[in-house]
Amino acid sequence: MSEIQNTMIVAANAIRKGSVDVRTKKLCHYTSPDGLLGIFKEGAPTLFFSQYDSLNDTKERKDIFESLKKYCDKQLKKGIMSKELYDAIVSIPQSDLFGITRKTNKKLILDNGEIVEDITAFADEECYTYICSFSKNNDSLPMWRMYSKAEHYEGFCVEFSSSAFSRKQYYRKGFSVELVKVIYDERKKMELIEGVLSPIMGLYDSATKRDKENLLSIVKIMIRDFQFVFKNKSFSYEEEIRAVLHIPKTESNNTGQVSERKYRQSNGLIVPYVIYNMEASSVRSITIAPTIKEEITVNNLKDYLCSKKLSHIHIISSDIPIRNV
């Protein structure tokens, strides 16, 4: 194995190490009373996924590029990174290419004559990206304040199972969805970037043109994988886990799991979005906001869920001792 190949493996491993496994985490979605009724309007739950550039963080998707430039500026000043590598990295553009798998009707005939049906097609395609936000905390005062859409912390927190976003939900269906845990801490961001770039910096200048392209491809993979993971530390109270949905721009989605591209008004903006359909079993519980009149709310919520054949959902009262004034 060449030194370049070994370096690429080390850098790729740093990317994998930086990825956070969120399969065992709670997926808690804060919403208003109207939002709750919207989620269960059709019985089985549905969620709105909004286009990434319409979310509350005006620097959504930009943090990875700012963090990367900050790291490269420091290494260039120290003389550790060459100007050539610096220029190559900071000029990497934002890309909407993401890997999509599709089921095809094509057949493959193997050398032994065996026929393989329904070949899976994989390609990087230009995609729209939509995000639905969750928290790992189902009873957070700042989250009640931010997302329940009322002055008196009135709202609900719906806990979903991560199985609603597992690979089997999208494989070969013409879209992709992944769960990621947001990174806010600046030190962790720099450590991840260091793990990827450190082995590359020592070899890049002396590498062939082809090897330089290969080394830069690892940096591009890091940007692709973490552009929706890095977020400004001001939002750290959200403890966000997000579902990131990629849908090709060139085709209509007709799987039934994801709606066509739609538009709605929010805070004066026209927001593109899609509706993601889930199974009833994906909902685990609903937590009631701290200042809602508990007894009548619990009874009415139970009645509502029963009418939607969702009586399996556990209802939880907030433990936050705050008075409604």
Task: State what each model feature region is.
Residues 1-325:
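Partner-binding and oligomerization surfaces adjacent to conserved cores of proteins
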